[in-house]
Amino acid sequence: MAEENEGTPVSVPIQENKEVKQETKMTSEPLQGNKSNNNRRPNNNNRKPNNNQNKNGEVKPNGNKPSNNKNKNRHRRQPTPIDENLRNFVTKNQEAHKQRLNPHYKLDLASKEKIRITPLGGLGEIGGNICVFETDNEAILVDVGMSFPDETMHGVDILIPDFSYIREIKDKIVGVVITHAHEDHIGAMPYLYKEMQFPIFGTPLPLAMIGTKFDEHHIKEFRKYFNPIEKRQLIKIGNDFEVEWMHMTHSIIDSSSIAINTAAGTVIHTGDFKIDYTPVDGYTADLHRLAYYGDKGVLCLMSDSTNSYNTVPTGSELSVGPALDRVFSKAEGRILLSTFSSNIHRVQQAIQYGIKYGRKVCVIGRSMERNIEIAMQYDYVRFNKSIFIDADEVSRYNDKEVLIVTTGSQGEANSALFRMSIGEHRHVKIKPTDLIVLSSRAIPGNEGSISGMLNHLQRAGATVSYDKDIHVSGHASMEEQKLMLRLVNPKFFLPIHGEYNHVMKHRGTGIMCGVPERNILLMTDGEQIEVAPKYMRKVKTVKTGKTYIDNQNNHQIEDDIILDRQKLASDGVVMMIVEVSEQNSKMLDKPKVTTFGIVADKQDKAFAKE
């Protein structure tokens, strides 16, 4: 009956003690048992029907249960002073959460001050990072990076940002602030400083690497603009800016996030980052300082978007060591390890495991040699110089006694590893017993170059190790981005450093972490954003773009030259040679016509005849 009429009222005749038990349970009255005693209740069959029962004791069809108001009132506890006190503290804690989590309450909303932020590179792309922070009277630049050309930019080696807007405001600029020493953040510094100079503020390693670039470009005298800083100290730059560098973990040592303090409020720029809880040098990210600013109140956060799609926390650099140990332990011949030359902790671990297995270390590649030399010079890493050998000494040692650390992990045509793979390196030729370890990921666009180099290496008989666990990223995953957002707790959020889909994904993470959708803007290069305690808005667009550089002579290549080269590459060339008399300017012979990229060689004569 109950299953068939679940949720609907039924009539139950009250005839036996069994039914009495059910009725007493339904009315929540205590059941005393069936034994006869002085306290026994009268038989329910003799009860006077209540308003919900008919004369036969059946429940009326409306299904209302017998009233229990009397019992409910009897068991309801009246509020006491302590209850009211607890309720008051619940309200107070809710208000405390509101104050803690809503940055709106931490800012000076009466302030009329504002700051303008203008990215000139690094958005809609990976690389070329440069950003202008500007008040009414002064401005600073954060990073001055380069990027790499695509395959259509014939004869172009690097791209640098268009400095047109910097030329417009150069009299306002009071300094250049550097977050870290990767090429996409410092690579364009020599080209800027050949034209205009400002004080440069940064930690020692980035300044040292900028110094080597100045030396290569024959502008060594501009080292005088260096201002090394101490982390966790406020550095006054001009009158309108106070900047603090906070240690951050990344794929290059001595990286920083920065807090830019202005009259309008504090802007946190993360730089490139990941949250590595077990870094090789033990220097974890300064989360305490980020939290300090978050508690104090942050006007705007600008955060790295590169790994926005990665939902798994980024692996620790220290985790690569055991993987290298496993690979090195099985090697019977030479080991050739290639990685990014700037990843000094990766190189450090490779050298340590090479030493463990009794190998001498040969570092090949100009950028690799330079970076290791700088790191050792300033005691970022320490090795006995006796473990190193030159490239021309490699052949003097047994193969099992040699570790070669080299550039070329991206298959670059002029890199050391690529030249080894095609047999063109002067000192090192690939052998069938060699183990090649690629400890890097493919930068988007380089997959074809890497694949071609791998083909060359394997045709030479070498074994190639390209395992996933011998590389970890240097950029924050979604979970680390969430941690940054929660620690800093900004009122406004500007996702940066990545292609449009990366910053769009990061925007969603920001909304997930409590930043109102209206307080997030997706910038593009050249868009100027004005930020004040009460608002954030786009105000104008400035000229931006790319300048093409030929590394052979460090000269700029004009845009129309690149367009001509692209046209020549797609359409081909016709060359006509005509011999003309000096006396009367008449042709002395039939013209000779040669074509390139138009018809096949065997058809060239027929084409010329036509």
PLM regions with names:
Residues 78-175, 182-397, 415-429, 448-451:
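His/Asp/Glu-rich metal-coordinating catalytic cores
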Residues 1-97:
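Intrinsically disordered, low-complexity RNA-associated tracts
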Residues 309-439, 443-490, 494-610:
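Hard-cation-handling environments
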